[in-house]
């Protein structure tokens, strides 16, 4: 049994029992195994407005680690997972540093908040520890804030905007149109608004209004009244977390009929809104209805274990853990610098889609397919999860994957 300085065995057992009684948001999970395990740190929001997404992330990373260990681990060594609630940027930084300095993790995986992702990446860079971001979208993390030891399986905001933008252009909702946007008032939202304005300017549209919304806001009625008065051609959501769920529910209650679309999206938030409350066109990095053998297996395994299908955050954390294990096996090393070199050489990874993905060397963004989903009419909804139809993969099969990503001119990255 490995020991943990400052935490007695009795404290760990009591905490674990409390965590089992209260669910995954309880005491941080620490698995104790043989001394030659590979320790990996997992940080993600498990409380607050991003907590519902963090719950999927934790469940998925547990599933991935259990599968890896059941298959013999990595190079004969089991993975030991240390999981913590990242809470906020300052706490995320503190916990990341503790994981590296005290717990000697080989790498860190996770996060959803772009602000917390930035502080974790600073620790990772200073300590030369691999950090694989699974949920932070901001272009800035791949641009001004890019780091040698940070990689992104989650798509950047530009990829979300360009993917959804294709559908909006096809629907005639861009050129000459007026948009009313609602934006989460933190790093992710600010970055997404900047990217969406760039897209709109390039395609002949304009904003009737853009409103910043505090992350703890729950009452959208004043903004809905403004939307009603503005009579926009399209209402755009740059919201995040349970903001999206609350907005969609209240939009329906107000009886507004203006088309809705979003540039930031997680399927769990649409599920939370409920039947009849999900509207419009949205981009997504992955969803549970993708028709590939790998997706079908993941959905079946996750649903059997947790009683519900996985959503896109679950996809990100699950695949991040799997690709880290794959890279460690291929390099026969857990050294972060060697793993960085392996990723930068164009290693390919199966991501449950029709094409393999790879990390772009210039900014460490995963190049992979995305999708646009369209809310189904209520009469066509058969259950609480299958509430949308999906586009084919974006980009198309004859297009390069990089076509939807930010160009170097749009988002320059200069790594030290």
Regions found by a protein language model. Give the residues of each.
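Extracytosolic ligand-binding ectodomains
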Residues: 2-17, 24-416
């Amino acid at each position: 049994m490995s020991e943990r300085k400052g935490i007695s065995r009795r404290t760990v057992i009591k905490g674990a029992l409390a965590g089992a009684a209260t669910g995954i948001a309880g005491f941080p999970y620490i698995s104790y195994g043989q001394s030659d395990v590979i320790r990996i740190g997992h940080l993600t929001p498990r409380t607050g407005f991003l907590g519902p997404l963090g719950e999927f992330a934790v469940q998925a990373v547990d599933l991935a680690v259990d599968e890896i260990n059941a298959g013999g681990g990595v190079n004969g060594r089991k993975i030991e997972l240390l999981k913590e609630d990242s809470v906020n940027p300052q706490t995320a930084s503190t916990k990341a540093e503790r994981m590296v300095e005290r717990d000697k993790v080989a790498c860190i995986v996770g996060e959803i908040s772009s602000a917390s992702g930035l502080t974790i990446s600073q620790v990772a860079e200073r300590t030369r520890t691999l950090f694989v971001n699974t949920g932070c979208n901001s272009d800035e993390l791949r641009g001004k804030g890019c780091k040698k030891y940070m990689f992104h399986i989650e798509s950047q905001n530009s990829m979300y905007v360009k993917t959804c933008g294709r559908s909006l252009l096809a629907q005639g909702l861009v050129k000459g149109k007026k948009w009313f946007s609602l934006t989460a008032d933190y790093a992710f939202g600010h970055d997404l608004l900047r990217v969406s304005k760039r897209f709109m300017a390039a395609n002949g549209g304009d904003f009737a209004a853009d409103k910043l919304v505090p992350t703890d806001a729950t009452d959208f009625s004043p903004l809905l009244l403004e939307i009603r008065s503005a009579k926009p051609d399209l209402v755009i959501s740059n919201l995040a977390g349970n903001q999206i769920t609350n907005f969609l529910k209240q939009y329906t209650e107000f009886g507004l009929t203006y088309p809705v679309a979003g540039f930031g999206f997680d399927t769990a938030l649409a599920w939370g809104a409920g039947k009849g409350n999900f509207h419009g066109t949205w981009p997504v990095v992955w969803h549970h209805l993708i028709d590939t053998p790998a997706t079908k297996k993941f959905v079946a395994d996750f649903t059997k274990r947790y009683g519900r299908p996985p959503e896109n955050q679950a996809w990100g954390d699950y695949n991040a853990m799997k690709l880290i294990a794959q890279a460690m096996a291929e390099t026969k090393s857990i050294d972060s610098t060697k793993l960085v070199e392996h990723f930068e050489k164009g290693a390919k990874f199966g991501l449950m889609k029709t094409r393999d993905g790879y990390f772009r060397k210039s900014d460490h963004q995963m190049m992979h397919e995305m999708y646009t989903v369209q809310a189904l009419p209520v009469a066509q909804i058969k259950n609480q999860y299958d509430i949308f139809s999906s586009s084919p993969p974006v980009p198309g099969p004859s297009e390069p994957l990089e076509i939807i990503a930010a160009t170097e001119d749009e988002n320059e990255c200069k790594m030290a």
